[in-house]
């Protein structure tokens, strides 16, 4: 199996009333309910998506539900880093 590192940028909360102060649980609860339109882009070492394929979105959601990610926040933007095991 191969691990692939994903970087995800999303808008969290209201675009006009952005927040930078959410607890880990608040961030996780928001991520569990994330919609495709909340994600601005997804990057790997070799690929880039602004319009995320449904299969990739489901893979990201599974990783989020498993709490397999690190994140940073600033001005209503959330940056996720996650590694996903890919089957050959």
Regions found by a protein language model. Give the residues of each.
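Short, surface-exposed linear segments at secondary-structure transitions and domain or protein termini
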Residues: 25-35
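Short intrinsically disordered terminal tails
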Residues: 1-5, 85-88
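Generic N-terminal leader/processing signal
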Residues: 1-3, 22, 59, 73
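A short, exposed loop/beta-hairpin motif centered on an aromatic-Gly-Thr core
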Residues: 12-23, 46-49
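Compositionally biased regions
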Residues: 8, 19-20, 24, 69, ...
């Amino acid at each position: 199996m191969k691990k692939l590192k994903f970087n995800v940028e999303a808008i969290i909360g209201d675009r006009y009333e952005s927040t930078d102060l959410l607890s880990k649980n608040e961030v996780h609860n928001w991520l569990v309910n994330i919609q495709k339109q909340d994600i601005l882009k997804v990057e790997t070492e070799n690929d880039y998506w602004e319009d995320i394929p449904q299969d990739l979105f489901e893979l990201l959601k599974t990783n989020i539900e498993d709490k397999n990610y690190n994140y940073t926040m600033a001005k209503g933007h959330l940056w996720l880093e996650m590694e996903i095991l890919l089957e050959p």
